[in-house]
Regions:
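Membrane-interface amphipathic segments in extracytoplasmic regions
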Residues: 1-240
């Protein structure tokens, strides 16, 4: 889902398993009549899609659209003038939520075909990595193209504070869209093994390096760029 509010000058880029649907439902109410609001599947009460197609009905904007794709449609000048933000989540928690959606969603698993258990999900390695949605490579370096990345764990505080700066008063995240996916609990975070955590965190290394939101050890920090890794491994007190 995508929200572009010309009234409040912001672009919301939806990421995976970060309360994005709930956020979009609430943002769509205050974004303005001329806002771009893409559809939600299945439909959610209180959400009104609008202005996401061309005059002939061809979709210009889509769900889970990347920031770079949005920039292409609205133009670089408009994109740079607007405040772009997204939400990220701790990797293990994010993967657990993704796993429950794959198993319990009547849309994603309509016929019950997806029957993998948690260890099989981890072994497959198809994790909900959203790095390309809010960043891009420039001269070999990964750079963010959004202005803010909000931590999922503190949305109740950070999202209203951000919107307050953009002129939206008394915003509250009330919607609880798709929370039913966790009613049948298949794995608790405490049951995730150390090996599974390492596997997930290895896959999310580039995300962790870019966002800086969650703990990252020295090895991960050195891996952010080959030059930094090269210099960090050079004996102290000598010249390369």
């Amino acid at each position: 889902m995508t929200i572009i509010s010309f009234k409040h000058n912001f672009v919301f880029i939806k990421t995976t398993k970060t309360a994005g649907t709930s956020i979009e439902v609430e943002l769509s109410k205050i974004a303005g009549d001329d806002a771009v609001v893409t559809p939600i599947v299945p439909e959610v009460e209180g959400h009104l899609p609008r202005n996401y197609t061309s005059a002939d009905g061809t979709p210009l904007f889509s769900a889970h659209m990347s920031a770079s794709a949005i920039r292409t449609v609205i133009g670089s000048m408009s994109f740079e003038r607007m405040h772009k933000f997204c939400v990220e989540r701790e990797p293990v928690s994010k993967c657990i939520s993704d796993f429950h959606m794959r198993r319990n969603s009547p849309v994603r698993n309509k016929d019950g075909v997806y029957r993998k258990d948690w260890p099989a999900y981890c072994s497959k390695g198809r994790f909900p990595i959203d790095l390309d949605k809010y960043s891009e490579r420039r001269i070999g370096l990964r750079v963010a193209i959004v202005d803010e990345m909000l931590p999922y764990e503190h949305l109740a505080q950070t999202l209203p504070a951000l919107l307050q700066k953009l002129g939206v008063r008394d915003f509250a995240l009330k919607a609880r869209a798709k929370s039913e996916y966790r009613r049948t609990v298949l794995i608790e975070e405490a049951a995730v093994t150390l090996a599974e955590r390492r596997l997930i965190y290895k896959a999310f290394r580039p995300t962790l390096a870019l966002t800086g939101m969650y703990p990252i050890d020295d090895e991960l920090a050195r891996s952010r760029h080959p030059l930094l890794r090269y210099l960090s491994e050079w004996p102290f007190g000598t010249s390369p």
